[in-house]
Design a protein with these regions (language model features):
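Autoinhibitory propeptides
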Residues: 2-98, 105-121
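Catalytic metal-binding/acid-base residues of hydrolase active sites
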Residues: 105-107, 253-255, 285-289
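Solvent-exposed, flexible loop/coil segments flanking beta-strands in beta-rich domains
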Residues: 279-325
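Conserved small/polar residues in nucleotide/adenosyl-binding loops
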Residues: 375-382
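Short acidic, glycine-rich surface-loop motifs adjacent to enzyme active sites
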Residues: 232-260, 283
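Catalytic-core regions built around general acid/base machinery
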Residues: 264-277
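Acidic, Ser/Thr/Pro-rich low-complexity intrinsically disordered segments
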Residues: 264, 311-313, 321-349
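Subtilisin-like serine protease catalytic core
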Residues: 87-224, 244, 325-326
Length: 383
């Protein structure tokens, strides 16, 4: 079958299609038969590269291009007030509740994730990084491990031979322990909901072409919006099978997009959170001193804003957003004084500029997305 390995193959671009019940619209928009349905509104389209190495200049709508997400800082999560939550008559220990973890995986062998009888708290684990038979997985890539398989591995002398899923960074394990780790009277530690069960998704890294599009250094980890949306879909599917209430937790975030909640993942999560028995928890508030954002009122006159870029930086991406129907233009000046000239926004378009002395190539894209106008700037070092 031509689409059998599309999700896990680097020979395909990935896009997020939005439709209203008629899936043929997505197939026609992206000229592909390779589609994975998320729900009645969103689907993932896999488009054969056919020799193309980048999506630059392909004129795909902004919201169809998956955003990249990174891991959020964990240093402020130690003091979460577990005792205060437990006080009075609430008795909140997570009994009967599932928590869906979307992160870097989990150390399933850790004793913090086993009940008193030795059984695992993990009801299902989808490792997107381990290639398996596409026909054996719910969403066509990765490998799924059931609670029975995990418990069989835990009884083995070599668990990793039976369930070879690891959390290399420890980020997902840390967060899972904080949320659902067992009480330890000797150390005084307890997860927030130690009796809760877990559904775990280990995200795969974003494909190289997508990291290149956002100027992300290959040595850094990033995760694609498509894989995150499918992770949410998977968690929903398992929770529905088990007939349990579910808390979907994402320890990841991004600076991209308008922050108005109009992106595909934003809207998908908002829709899930409206359902009875479903809650969504995301990270926030980790970048107060990082100066990653700037806002202001643009007057009729020019306004100068300086962007500091580190020496020998691999590249960077920056987005400018303004409310439609207002229009604005940008004029970018390099440290040596070379200017792009006025670049006026519009419905959609692109400009390519090379700063010779800085050995930098600048790509300026502009779109109109919903009720906002948007300019996306990407800069890369040239040889």
């Amino acid at each position: 079958m031509p689409c059998e390995n599309a999700a896990q193959s680097n020979d395909y671009f990935e896009f997020i299609g939005e439709y209203s019940g008629v899936l043929d619209y997505v197939k026609e928009e992206f000229n592909t038969e390779c589609i994975t349905v998320i729900d009645q509104r969103f689907a993932i389209a896999y488009v054969k590269k056919n020799g193309r190495t980048s999506i630059y200049g392909q004129n795909y709508p902004y919201n169809t291009i998956p955003r990249c997400f990174g891991l959020m800082d964990t240093q402020m999560l130690e003091d979460v007030g577990v005792a205060q939550v437990r006080r009075s008559t609430l008795d909140l220990y997570g009994n009967g509740v599932l928590v869906g973890m979307i992160d870097t995986g989990i150390d399933y062998e850790h004793p913090a994730f086993r009940y008193e009888d030795g059984s695992s708290k993990i009801y299902s684990l989808w490792d997107q990084t381990i290639e398996g038979d596409p026909e054996d997985t719910f969403l066509g890539y990765g490998t799924e491990y059931t609670k029975e398989q995990i418990e069989e591995a835990l009884k083995s002398d070599v668990p990793q031979q039976k369930v070879p899923s690891k959390d290399e960074s420890g980020h997902g394990t840390f967060l899972a322990g904080l949320i659902a780790g067992n009480e330890d009277n000797e150390t005084g530690f307890s997860g927030i909901a130690p009796n809760a069960g877990l559904i775990v998704v280990k995200l795969r890294k974003a494909k190289d072409y997508l990291k290149e599009y956002y100027c992300i250094d290959p040595k850094y980890e990033a995760y694609a919006e498509t894989d995150i949306m499918l992770a949410v879909h998977y968690i929903d599917h398992i929770a529905e099978q088990l007939q349990r209430p579910i808390v979907i937790f994402l320890g990841i975030g991004t600076n991209l997009a308008s922050h108005l909640g109009t992106g595909p993942l934003d809207q998908y999560l908002s829709g899930r959170a409206m359902l009875r028995g479903v809650a969504v928890v995301t990270s926030a508030g980790n970048e107060g001193q990082a100066r990653h954002h700037y806002s202001g009122q643009v007057s009729q006159n020019d306004e100068k804003v300086e962007v500091k870029v580190g020496e020998s930086e691999y590249g960077f991406a920056m987005e400018l957003w303004g409310l439609a129907p207002n229009r604005y233009y940008v004029d970018i000046e390099s440290p040596s004084g070379q200017k792009t000239g006025r670049i006026q926004g519009g419905l959609s378009g692109q400009r390519y500029v090379t700063f010779l002395l800085e050995k930098t190539r600048l790509i300026v894209e502009y779109f109109t997305v919903d009720t906002v106008s948007y300019t996306h700037l990407r800069a890369h070092e040239t040889s």
